[in-house]
Amino acid sequence: MVRKPVVATISKGGYLQGNMSGRLPSMGDQEPPGQEKVVLKKKITLLRGVSIIIGTVIGSGIFISPKGILQNTGSVGMSLVFWSACGVLSLFGALSYAELGTSIKKSGGHYTYILEVFGPLLAFVRVWVELLVIRPGATAVISLAFGRYILEPFFIQCEIPELAIKLVTAVGITVVMVLNSTSVSWSARIQIFLTFCKLTAILIIIVPGVIQLIKGQTHHFKDAFSGRDTSLMGLPLAFYYGMYAYAGWFYLNFITEEVDNPEKTIPLAICISMAIITVGYVLTNVAYFTTISAEELLQSSAVAVTFSERLLGKFSLAVPIFVALSCFGSMNGGVFAVSRLFYVASREGHLPEILSMIHVHKHTPLPAVIVLHPLTMVMLFSGDLYSLLNFLSFARWLFMGLAVAGLIYLRYKRPDMHRPFKVPLFIPALFSFTCLFMVVLSLYSDPFSTGVGFLITLTGVPAYYLFIVWDKKPKWFRRLSDRITRTLQIILEVVPEDSKEL
């Protein structure tokens, strides 16, 4: 059976079409009547959607080192203003994605919207960088935080060995991959539990902070807008840190096809999640300042631990566990969502065919999940992991800005397009400008890293013409590619998705 992708792909087909019995039939076989289709099921309810957004946005930063904004604003009051403003701007981006997700009912997020508006080249470059660098690197970073804080209660009196951190991290990554390969339902249920843990951890900080306010502990808020002298360059950097802290609201759009009743669920999940996150972030910072001065917060290596040691006594030992669970939730949500990006890109012919196949029994995009495992392990044991991510930090904002600018373009080019959820045009316009500002700021503040990242991103252009456009590849290459695909199908028990209405 030969697949016909949107554009020429590495292999011209030759994979095997399977069925729910796990058998790979011959061309003459008939599918039993009433047999369940091999597709990704619509199992993402409103609660699960909310848990995915909250679970991926809230990582370790708010608990460990929320000082980037304070350091660059110079005052308690201005830092709280920036936390609130960045929450509102992130909500604008999320609302823009809600319109895109309900108008273009396909999974894939940025990739799908860029493909729809700007064509295959830019879309391929987006998924190229995401697959090879950004997602493995980001997963490794949040996983390292998980490994460090899960071990911290066992190494109170001494430094945690780096090898131990990486080994525990590797175990955590493997558990996440296995979980997402095994069951969509269980991944979503565990994500709900981990989101509950995150919110519990935030409440453990907020409630004592509110009690402190009731007791009159407001001396750190006196002259809240006076403090250290801050250069004008500091304010854009504070804005950059704030927007980065809210990043992750777009992940629900990566799994649009699995969302139950997306026209209602996506906008509701986005609004509920962003409201909870913004209020939670602001109140957590307010709680910190009821007990910790601005100077102490800037010097602390783990703000939540410092806060809990002063107010909660021995209960502060639980904070590292909550941070580890928070990191695990970010790992799980990120892998769950981004695997669908690779799945959709493969379905469009931009990645190897095997990545668009589904397990015949578990109905999970197994190859698209496990492809992240070796790439993440390489990143985990790489010495320049953080530098590599810094090189490519601008790319996220560039492609998000393009996707939201595409919304404005579609308003004028396709005015009759069905839009169940529609936002005022100033919202995507303001957010697109915000993304442009973030890219320019990256270039201005660190031109070398941004330049290197831009060059890495540009490698996607020759890769596109070599792997996608060039369709006169040697026959031996095609045969080898098809043989590898068929072998992996048999080993992994995966088949192409049955056709379905989107």
Swiss-Prot record:
Sample GO molecular function, one term: cystine:glutamate antiporter activity
Keyword NADP annotated:
no
Task: Summarize induction of expression.
Answer: Induced by diethyl maleate. Up-regulated by lipopolysaccharide (LPS) and oxygen.
What keywords sit in the KW lines? Amino-acid transport, Cell membrane, Cell projection, Disulfide bond, Membrane, Phosphoprotein, Transmembrane, Transmembrane helix, Transport, Ubl conjugation
UniProt record, GO biological process: adult behavior; brain development; cellular response to oxidative stress; cellular response to stress; dipeptide import across plasma membrane; glutathione metabolic process; glutathione transmembrane transport; intracellular glutamate homeostasis
Q: In which tissues is it expressed?
A: Expressed in cornea, lens, and retina (at protein level), namely in the corneal epithelium, lens epithelium and cortical fiber cells.
Q: Which GO terms describe its cellular component?
A: apical part of cell; astrocyte projection; brush border membrane; cell surface; membrane; microvillus membrane; plasma membrane
Tell whether Disulfide bond is among the UniProt keywords: yes
> In the record, which positions carry Phosphoserine?
S26
Q: Where are the transmembrane segments?
A: 44-64, 75-95, 131-150, 164-179, 194-210, 235-255, 266-286, 318-338, 365-385, 388-408, 423-443, 450-470
**UniProt-listed InterPro entries:** AA/rel_permease1, AminoAcid_Transporter, L_AA_transporter
Subcellular locations according to the entry: Cell membrane; Cell projection, Microvillus membrane
Instruction: Report which superkingdom the organism of origin falls in.
Output: Eukaryota
Show the catalytic activity: L-cystine(out) + L-glutamate(in) = L-cystine(in) + L-glutamate(out); an L-alpha-amino acid(in) + L-kynurenine(out) = an L-alpha-amino acid(out) + L-kynurenine(in); N-acetyl-L-cysteine(out) + L-glutamate(in) = N-acetyl-L-cysteine(in) + L-glutamate(out)
Q: Which residues lie on this side of the membrane: Cytoplasmic?
A: 1-43, 96-101, 117-130, 180-193, 256-265, 339-364, 409-422, 471-502
Processing and modification events after translation = Ubiquitinated by TRIM26; leading to proteasomal degradation.
Q: Known Pfam families for this protein?
A: AA_permease_2 (PF13520)
NCBIfam families linked? 2A0308
Which family, according to the similarity comment? Belongs to the amino acid-polyamine-organocation (APC) superfamily. L-type amino acid transporter (LAT) (TC 2.A.3.8) family.
Q: What does this protein do?
A: Heterodimer with SLC3A2, that functions as an antiporter by mediating the exchange of extracellular anionic L-cystine and intracellular L-glutamate across the cellular plasma membrane. Provides L-cystine for the maintenance of the redox balance between extracellular L-cystine and L-cysteine and for the maintenance of the intracellular levels of glutathione that is essential for protection of cells from oxidative stress.
Name of this chain's protein: Cystine/glutamate transporter
List the lineage, top down: Eukaryota, Metazoa, Chordata, Craniata, Vertebrata
Gene that encodes it: Slc7a11
